[in-house]
Amino acid sequence: MDGDRFHRISSVGVAVTPETMKMPGIDILRGVMNGTLPQAGISKSLNFWISEVEEGRVVFAGEPGEESINPMGGVHGGWSLTMIDSACGCAAMSILPPGVGYTTLETKGNLTRAIRPNSGVFRCEAKLLARGRQIITSDATLTGPDGKLYAHGTSTLMVLRPQG
């Protein structure tokens, strides 16, 4: 899962361009995952990456390091919540047709245990809960290398269709 993470996050930029807008969302995500399309800058900054993609389900992997430390010496809760928000959004993106995007309306999360920096690779799995014409909801769980639950959350996303 984490063997070639540096390959996966070596290219940073915007994956959604006029050219990629002709592709289904799942193909864009697969391109980001395999390195043919750039990873979002936030992923490089917080050291997480897409490790699995299928329709309605996305898995991110990430390793919190020194860049994620809060003033008390633990990993800032924002690291977990950012992974949850990213994974939930990408789960929604995985079902979108070409030319259709999304934006997060709300993400709620619960942190269930503290994360220590440099404690290994964490896994954030997101799945769709409901798919409507304009609103998608998804949920995610963040588990540690020990298999324990560290956080969970849900996102409400709005589908953005081209105007005109």
Regions found by a protein language model. Give the residues of each.
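Terminal targeting signals and extreme-terminal segments of soluble enzymes
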Residues: 1-164
